[in-house]
C-alpha cells in the first residue's frame, strides 16, 4: 500500500505542474490599479478605510493626574493587606510566592476568586512588606 502511494506521488511530481495554467501574471502593474490619495479615501473606492481621517480631538477636557498617584494603592486594598499582614508575614518567612499562597488558600476551602484576590494582595505586599504592618 505504501509503495502505491509512493509511486503515485513520484508520478505526480514528474508529470504534474503546480502552477495554474489559466492565470496570466504580468510584472507590470496596471495603471488602473494606481489611485491618488484623495480617491482612496472615498468610501465608494474602499469598503473599509485603512487611514484615519478624523481631526485630532481637543484634549483640553481630559482628566489629568500625576503618574505617582496612578500607582498608589486603593485604601481598601491597603486595609485588606494590613488585615492579612500576619498571614502574609508567615508566608514571607516560608519564602512563598503568590502562586504558593493561591494554592494554599484554595486548598483550605476558599473559592477560586477569593484565593486569587488574596494572592494578588500578597503580590502587592511583597513589594514593600514594611509598609503594611498590622493594626
Swiss-Prot record:
Its primary localisation, in coarse terms, equals secreted
Keyword terms, alphabetized: Host cytoplasm, Host nucleus, Secreted, Signal, Virulence
Per the UniProt entry, the signal peptide is 1-18
Point out the coiled-coil segments of this chain: none
Q: Name one GO cellular component term.
A: extracellular region
Question: What residue spans carry the region label NRL1-binding domain?
Answer: 126-135
Keyword Signal (UniProt): yes
Q: Where in the cell is it found?
A: Secreted; Host cytoplasm; Host nucleus, Host nucleoplasm
- Signal: present as a keyword of the record? yes
- Positions occupied by motif RxLR-dEER: 48-64
- Gene Ontology BP terms: symbiont-mediated perturbation of host small GTPase-mediated signal transduction
The UniProt entry's sequence similarity note says:
Belongs to the RxLR effector family.
- Give the record's subunit note: Interacts with host ubiquitin E3 ligase NRL1.
Q: What does this protein do?
A: Effector that promotes P.infestans virulence and suppresses pattern-triggered immunity (PTI). Interacts with the host ubiquitin E3 ligase NRL1 and enhances the association between NRL1 and SWAP70 to promote proteasome-mediated degradation of SWAP70, which results in the suppression of immunity.
Per the record, the domain comment is:
The RxLR-dEER motif acts to carry the protein into the host cell cytoplasm through binding to cell surface phosphatidylinositol-3-phosphate. The C-terminus (residues 126 to 135) is required for the interaction with host NRL1 and the ability to enhance the association of NRL1 with SWAP70.
This chain's protein is named: RxLR effector protein PITG_02860
- The scientific name of the source species is Phytophthora infestans (strain T30-4) (Potato late blight agent)
Amino acid at each position: 500500500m505504501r509503495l502505491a502511494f509512493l509511486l503515485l506521488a513520484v508520478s505526480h511530481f514528474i508529470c504534474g505542474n503546480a502552477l495554474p495554467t489559466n492565470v496570466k501574471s504580468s510584472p507590470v502593474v496596471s495603471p488602473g490599479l494606481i489611485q491618488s490619495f484623495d480617491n482612496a479615501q472615498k468610501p465608494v473606492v474602499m469598503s473599509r478605510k485603512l487611514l484615519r481621517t478624523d481631526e485630532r480631538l481637543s484634549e483640553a477636557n481630559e482628566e489629568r493626574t500625576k503618574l505617582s498617584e496612578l500607582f498608589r494603592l486603593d485604601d481598601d486594598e491597603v486595609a485588606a493587606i494590613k488585615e492579612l499582614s500576619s498571614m502574609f508575614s508567615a508566608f514571607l518567612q516560608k519564602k512563598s510566592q503568590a502562586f504558593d499562597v493561591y494554592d494554599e488558600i484554595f486548598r483550605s476551602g476558599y473559592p477560586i476568586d477569593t484565593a486569587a484576590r488574596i494572592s494578588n494582595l500578597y503580590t502587592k505586599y511583597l513589594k514593600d512588606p514594611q509598609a503594611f504592618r498590622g493594626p
